[in-house]
């Protein structure tokens, strides 16, 4: 079982993640902006964070950088539109994956399985 944080200003996306991943036996929390995500990561040790790029209050890239300052948690980026150069940039910063919306649930589940089965440093 993995502890997963889903960060997206669209509540429906967070609810879909919760339904699907809880069905698979994972614990799923939601945050609706970057600031809330940072606070949650400070308070709880997650195995994986799915982070939207475009959100109010704090853009995903800034939230990503702040999360990486306080935690070693793997972060997967998701967005409705990610240009190839932006995707390379995000991966170079240390994201474990970039997902385009609508999400491919098989790929999401595959990443969760990979993270769960990877020994922590």
Predicted regions and their residues:
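Alpha4 helix (beta4-alpha4-beta5 surface) of REC/receiver domains from two-component response regulators
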Residues: 62, 82-99, 107-110
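Active-site beta3 strand of CheY-like receiver
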Residues: 44-50
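Receiver (REC) domain active-site loop signature in two-component systems and cognate sites
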Residues: 55
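Hydrophobic/aromatic residues positioned on beta-strands within the core alpha/beta folds
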Residues: 78-79
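Two-component/phosphorelay signaling modules centered on CheY-like receiver
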Residues: 11-29
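Acidic catalytic/metal-coordinating carboxylates
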Residues: 33-36, 59-63
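Receiver (REC) domain switch/active-site region of two-component response regulators
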Residues: 104
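Conserved phosphotransfer cores of two-component systems
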Residues: 42-44, 66-73, 93
């Amino acid at each position: 079982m993995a502890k997963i944080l889903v960060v997206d200003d669209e509540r429906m996306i967070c609810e879909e993640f919760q339904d699907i991943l809880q069905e698979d036996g994972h614990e799923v929390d939601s945050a609706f902006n970057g600031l809330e995500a940072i606070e949650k990561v400070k308070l709880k040790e997650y195995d994986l964070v799915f982070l939207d790029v475009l959100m109010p209050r704090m853009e995903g890239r800034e939230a990503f950088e702040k999360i990486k300052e306080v935690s070693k948690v793997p972060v997967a980026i998701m967005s409705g539109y990610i240009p190839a150069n932006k995707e390379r940039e995000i991966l170079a910063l240390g994201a474990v994956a970039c997902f385009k919306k609508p999400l491919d649930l098989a790929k999401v589940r595959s990443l969760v399985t990979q993270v769960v089965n990877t020994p922590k440093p």
